[in-house]
Amino acid sequence: MHMVAPVVWTPEMVRALPDDGQRYETVHGELLVTPAPRVTHQRVLSRLLTALVRYLDREPIGELLTSPADISLGDDSLVQPDLFVVDAQDAGATAWADIKHLLLVVEVLSPSSVRADCTVKRALYQSHGIPTYWAVDADARVVEVWTPLADHAVVERERLRWRPTVAASLFELELTTLFA
């Protein structure tokens, strides 16, 4: 029997895929495909985006961007986080390849993305030293907060807080507001 070698996906291969409404990413050569998000996902994402925009207006430490995006983390990984804050030194970049310094990455979990967001991509974000990663679970009404060296998440159930080292003030958001 002839064995076929598994495909190792590259960022270039992912960029060449058709724009068909699916989200395509690759992490260490594994292709991740997720369908369009649910309404709840988008509602939570909008509330979080609004709160972060207000915070970044007060604390101009970087720029908030959303997917679709092509964020390369290493030669074999291309991700599209739901929301991410780019450090001020990369703010204003005109090409995705120019974005190298992320302060915050946010994934709002969907049933189809839980494994990728909570294990595969979380480990990737940690290994690349992204200071803070939020896995937002609208169904459980919690946010897992991960940092690069953490073995376990801090699970926020009431209030989400974020204080980048370059910021003078604290970001705070009541989870009852986020999940209203």
Question: Which residues fall in each region the model found?
Answer:
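Gly/Pro/Ser/Thr-rich low-complexity, intrinsically disordered segments predominantly at protein N-termini
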Residues: 1-180
